[in-house]
Design a protein with these regions (language model features):
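Alpha/beta catalytic cores of nucleotide-metabolism and tRNA/nucleoside-modifying enzymes
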Residues: 194-202, 211-263
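Hydrophobic faces of well-ordered beta-strands that scaffold small-molecule active sites
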Residues: 14-18, 43-45, 94-98, 123-125, ...
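Glycine-rich phosphate-binding active-site loops on the catalytic face of alpha/beta enzymes
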Residues: 41-51, 120-124, 129-132, 174-180, ...
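Catalytic cores of alpha/beta
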Residues: 25-36, 154-164, 206, 210-226
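Conserved, mostly hydrophobic/aromatic
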Residues: 16, 35, 46, 115, ...
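N-terminal amphipathic alpha-helix/helix-capping segment at the start of soluble metabolic enzymes
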Residues: 1-17, 79-85, 262-263
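Glycine-rich beta-to-alpha transition loops that act as phosphate-gripper elements at the mouths
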Residues: 19-24, 97-105, 129-130, 150-154, ...
Length: 263
């Protein structure tokens, strides 16, 4: 199974997010393959949930659309299994972004057993307090799955505590609030990333609010990569099952921007 750190071995990483089941699970599968061809180094697959508290309207609406198609967690595992097999198997790391509730309702042991089976490298759980990470991580680690920590602008003491315990990569949240596209990112990301790097040597990628190539380049200059969600989900929302070319072009332009940052 591809490990998260592999995503950062070829220079600065571009990490797109897609909401599973939005406009149908078959389209999600095809779009992941397209994003990989366009240069994605790792893909975050969102498991739709009825109360996604960290998400802005774009991803909330995608979750609602996906749930209305009747998509279930088992369907998402089946999709990942298909992505990982065959001549055109996806080999880059794939991680789930989900909330505590879907994992607990599905059953933690069963969830992480299937993650291992289909080739999920890690999970990101935005509503999980750091203090509760151990409980989930103890089950995840049995199955070789890393639990990615999010670090938002906060005190150095808290950054130290979270960074020292981090695994896979650190998801550095560019601004407080929910996900979504922002015209400007006002947080001093450079200082936060430098602080994180005092306490860990694992990669740090920045997300929340990045939508333009110049923003991705700026963030990748001070970190190890850029994460983009809402802008990708918006392309799928606008083009439905005909988003192939628009997605390819967008991901390719964002990948080129982060590579420029590392040049």
């Amino acid at each position: 199974m591809s490990k998260i750190k592999d995503a950062f071995t070829k220079g600065k990483a571009f990490i797109p997010f897609i909401s599973a089941g939005d406009h149908g699970i078959e389209n999600t599968e095809r779009y992941i393959r397209i994003m990989v061809k366009a240069g994605a180094d790792m893909v975050e697959i969102g498991i739709p949930f009825s109360d996604p508290t960290a998400e802005g309207p774009v991803i909330q609406e995608a979750s609602t659309r996906a749930l209305s198609t009747g998509v279930k967690i088992n369907d998402i595992f089946d999709m990942v299994r298909r992505l990982r097999t065959g001549d055109d198997a996806v080999t880059i790391p794939l991680v789930f972004m989900t909330y505590l509730n879907p994992i607990y309702v599905f059953g933690r042991e069963k969830f992480f057993t299937l993650c291992e089976e289909v080739g999920i490298s890690g999970v990101i759980v935005p509503d999980m307090p750091f203090e509760e990470k151990g409980e989930l991580a103890s089950v995840a680690h049995k199955h070789g799955v890393e639990v990615v920590s999010l670090i938002a602008p906060t005190s150095e003491n808290r950054i130290e505590m979270i960074a020292k315990d981090a695994e896979g990569f650190v998801y550095c949240v560019s601004s407080l609030g929910v996900t979504g596209m922002r015209s400007k990112i006002k947080t001093d990301i450079k200082s936060i990333v430098e602080m994180i790097r005092k306490y860990t040597d694992i990669p740090v990628a920045v997300g929340f609010g990045i939508s333009k190539p110049e923003q991705a380049e700026t963030m990748a200059r001070v970190s190890d990569g850029a994460i983009v969600g809402s802008a990708i989900v918006k392309i799928v929302a606008e083009h439905g099952e005909h988003a192939d070319q628009a997605l390819f072009d967008y991901v390719q332009s964002m990948k080129q921007a982060v590579l420029k940052a590392g040049a």
